[in-house]
Amino acid sequence: ISKKAGDVDLSLELVDKGGLKLWNEFIDRYHYLGYNPLPGAQMRYFVKDQDEILALLGFSAAAWKTAPRDSFIGWDAQRRKQNLHLVVNNSRFLVLPWVQSKNLASRILALAGKRLPSDWQDRYHYRPVLLETFVEKERFEGTCYKAANWIYVGDTQGRGKLDIRHEHKVPVKAVWVYPLHRRYRDLLGGVR
């Protein structure tokens, strides 16, 4: 497909058990990180134009601890522990390689930001107030997140969640967040 983003009739389809194998296969085959199970609470979408799958999104539990996000919110350890469930991680985003459409990725992110809170509420009985994502700096610039009004809050140290010896074994990632509620900081218990 090579349409202008404005000419694409975008829709998000929540992936059910019947579509899970296909979603996993696309991610395994075409996403640079491949397939790994998503952590904690999670939600997956196919992004379609009519019946054609253009892209895939995966959302899951937020990272337990990341200094740029925690500092941006104004969290201490106790408030993070109490309210982390209100942050959701955009853990996978894949526009399929044969899809060429300028501005499509930012349109998809904007659509997901509108749709996800109510879907999450329906499934998990609470409404998230902030999205986060991690963009590998050596591979990507985060242009689609910037164009969709996400906020860059800093970089990881390149340690990863399992690095207890400070060996810096994973790529540095840019941390981006997207408020889903204008009072997100108050609702998260942040202090500024």
What name fits each language-model region?
Residues 184-192:
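Flexible, glycine-/basic-rich loop-and-beta segments that form/coincide
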